[in-house]
Amino acid sequence: MVWFKRFGLLALALVLIGALAAYAFQARLGTWLFERGTAQRMGVDNLAALGDGLHVGLCGTGSPMPNLDRAGPCNVVIAGKQMYVVDIGEGAAETLNVMGISPGKADGLLLTHFHSDHIDGFGPLMLFHWTRGSSTAPLPVYGPKGVEAIVAGFNAAYATDNTYRIAHHGPRVVPPSGAGGIARPFDMAGPATTVLEHDGLKITAFTVNHDPIKPSVGYRFDYKGRSLCISGDTKKSSNLEAVCKGVDILVHEALNPALVQKMEAAAAANGQAGAAKIMHDIQDYHTAPWEAVESAQTAGAGMLVLSHLVPPLPSRWLYAAFLGDAKSRFSGPIVVGEDGMMFSLPAGSKTIDRTRLIRGTG
């Protein structure tokens, strides 16, 4: 017993000595940890680890409502060696970097519509595309007609900053010809149109119903026998169900009206009439989780991934309340999306692989 007590006292003394040493040398330890962490992060390129196939990463699963764990709406699609970003909400360009996916490698940005929360991360994206990739050409920005004004506005807003970057870093690092974005509008005369076909990848835009916001589209990606759809913002859409027939993955927006109604009531009770009106209005042009599930079932999708989540879901404990009875309406897996999730569809296979590139919601 005496030896046990002595051992305990010795262990406690060693712990205290260690703590005091760590405190005394915290600056040196901090510098060492920072150097080590920086070296590891700078060497990360998660694109290099992806096999040939079609991949979709969630770089923003949030909405305009504040949520520290979720950037604004954003998806990144990789097909072979091609990479396209779909929508770019606030904080999403930074999230791409944290995911170990360099925006400098983006071949283009595809916009579903021009709501502010889908474009307010465009400035950082085009800056990272230029500076991290030493790009010699602007970032192509695809979207329905009207995208020209969006791109022109951001280019004008960043024009002065571009001159600062060139003067400071030099044209070899930031070639003047690579600054900003360049609009690539397409016409949506019918329910669907091919946006581009290149090196085995086909991207199709299709109309959705986000009235009164027009134009509004979603996108289908096909590559080497694998396919996925991204809904954009929409009410439940029969056109989406038709165009996305048989996809491996459907990434669909979702708003739970019952939970938003509770936010509406709370805002009204606290004298916030404007916020209450907005909470009321947004319920009529989005899709409830159980409706998204029905669309996935009708389309025959292999997996449903919910994103652009309204209201904010700061904890996984809220997921059951958010989904309601959705799981009973779909024969496949349902995933409540979190920033940093990556889904892979290997070419020549029917499997769906999942990984996480950053830590998720608690």
Question: What spans do the regions from the language model cover?
Answer:
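Binuclear metal-dependent hydrolase catalytic cores
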Residues: 2-229, 316-350, 356-361
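Cap/insert and terminal regions of metallo-dependent hydrolase folds
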Residues: 2-18, 217-218, 224-229, 235-339
